[in-house]
Structure formats: C-alpha cells, structure tokens
Amino acid sequence: MLEKLPRTLYWENGALFLLDERRLPHEAAYLECTLSGQVCDAIAQLAVRGAPAIGDAGAYAVALWCLNERPADESAFEAAFEERCGQIAAVRPTAVNLSWAVSRCAAAVMSALAAGLGVPAAASAALELAHATLEDDIASCKRIGELALPELRALAERLGRPLRVQTHCNAGSLATGFYGTATSVIYHGWEAGLIEKVWVDETRPVGQGARLTAWELMQAGVPCTLVCDNMAGALMQAGQVDMVVVGADRICANGDFANKIGTYPLAVLAQHHGVPFYTAAPQSTFDRSLASGADIVIEQRDPLEVRSALTAGGWELVAPADVEVFNPAFDVTPHQLLAGIFTEDGILRV
C-alpha cells in the first residue's frame, strides 16, 4: 500500500538527496546536497522536517562536512569538526533527534581518530554511521506500527467497529526515513482492518497536515478527511473521533512531550471528551536528561508564517504586514493527558 510514497531522503553517488517538502503536494522534487550547509538550510527552511528525518539528515550533514569540507591541515580537524557539529545540531533546537544523530556521528569520528585510523577513515566512519541512522530509523518506524496493533485491536473490539482516528501535523513517512511514527500506527491499523478513516488537522501556520499528511494518506489509499485545527472540538463533541495519535519531537523523562503547535489543545479536548490520546516516537526522540516539559527549548519561527498563507507560489500575505506575531513552532503536552506512547519497544504508559 505504500509503494506510491516517495523516499524522504537517500544517498547516491556521493550526494544526499532530500525530498523538498515545501513543494508538496504540487510537485515531488529533490534537493541534491554535497555540502553540510545545504543540508542545514534545508532543515531550517522546512524542506526536510520531522524529528527522525532531520536526525537522519543531520547525520549526513556531518558526513558531508567530513568528506568535502574538512580543513586541508589535518591538525586543525578536531577543533573545526567540533565547531561544525555544534552548528549543525543547533539548526532546530526542539527536535532532539538532530542533536542525538550529530552526537552519534561525532562519536564515530572521534573513535576512528582515537584508534589512529586517520581523518579519511574517520570521514568514512561518519558516512557509515549516517547510513546506519537512516536504516535504523526505517526499522524502528515499522516496528512502532506493528507493536501498536494490540492496542488498536482492543479499542476497536470495545467499540465493535473500526476506529476513526485524528492526527495533527505530519508524523508520517515524510517525517522519517519511511513508514512514519503516527502514520505507521495508522498504516498497520488500516491494513489490519482496525481503522475506518483518518481526520487530518490542517496544522496552521505551515499546513503540514493539509499539504503533507492528507497527500501522504491519499497516496497510501487510506480514507481521510481534512479539517481546520479549530474543528477538532466539534468533531469530538459529535462522537466522530475514537482516538488521536500524533508524533513527537522531544519526550522528557516524565513523559511530557513537545510536538507541533496545536497538539496540546488537541490533547485537552481529547481528555474532555474521553478520547484516548497517544503519541508515537522512536527511542531516539526520548530525552531523559530533561525532567519535564518545562525544560524544553521551544523554537520561535518567522512571523511571516502567521501573517501569510503558504500557496503553490510561495507565501501570500493575508494579515497586516506589520501586525505583531507570536509563532512558537511547538507546544508541550503534559504526560497526564497521554493514554500511552507507541515506540519500537512497545507501548509505554506514563
């Protein structure tokens, strides 16, 4: 069912190719990256997005720097490498997968150097680690969906029918190496006959639900209906939502998690209406160094996103050009609102 979905990123002939998601759903085009800065720009500008996918891309950014941009003087390598890794990890601060993947690549490089293998071998180690990061991401996402099936089956059996699921933003194949996190749950549930349809929040201000999730589900043949974010309460009040599943960009030790702005009010609505609310994420999204959501740094984005609507031709101004804007990219959902966290190791209760 997923054969029509494009690869979010892949490595070929010494270059990283990133699906430019800014151009979806109108055009599927790839960016060819041979420099770390090109990857960083793609992450910052949302050409590639989603916590696991930007982790994958970040690992390749480290490898590209080692392969193509390292200083000619090998004695200057370590200091320059450490500085560049810090810059790559800081491109989007809320999603922990980016800093996690960069740290893993950095460790592989430093291990090769410590073993006396030299800078070229260390660069090769970075590339191997980037490949492994992508492969692990795909395997983890597939497992998330497989291990969610007992929970979906129990909910469907309780209701006596397949489930109507609501999701927010894009925690899909487009946000990962493949399968997605929340959509892996949806795809596996749909194939098993446990899901009837999906309600897709448009997800203002950048419209990841409207532009990406709706398109992705349609490509996969999963019935879906697009709704504005402020329609969720009416849907639940009418008894049209049986469960909610979203992704996550960072999960704290206590289960609080950051996800796309608008997730928190959706969780509050779900609790009020007795609708079970889940997040889905790989272990790489957990940041157990943070005690709670109060410790999460929230990225603030360009006011243009709120003043405008994103169209096929770019951003079109719809509000006064000088109106003051508050534009956090994420909000934090308290763990008390969660029915569970779907992971590649099974469901976690918090």
For the regions a language model picked out, list residue spans one by one.
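Short, hydrophobic/aliphatic alpha-helical segments
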Residues: L31-A47, L163-T167, L310-D322
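Long amphipathic alpha-helical segments
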Residues: R7-G116
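Conserved phosphate- and dinucleotide-binding cores of soluble alpha/beta proteins
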Residues: L194-I195, D201-V350
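Short beta-strand segments
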Residues: L19, A57, A101, Q166-N170, ...
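Conserved phosphate/anionic-ligand binding catalytic regions in large, soluble enzymes, centered on
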Residues: Q45-A61, R92, N97-L98, N170-Y179, ...
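Histidine-anchored nucleotide/phosphate-binding helix
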Residues: G180-E191, A267
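Generic structural signal for well-ordered, non-membrane alpha-helical segments
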Residues: E32, S36-V39, A51, G55, ...
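Ligand-binding beta-strand-loop-alpha-helix segment within the catalytic cores
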Residues: S99-L163, L194-E196, V200-V244
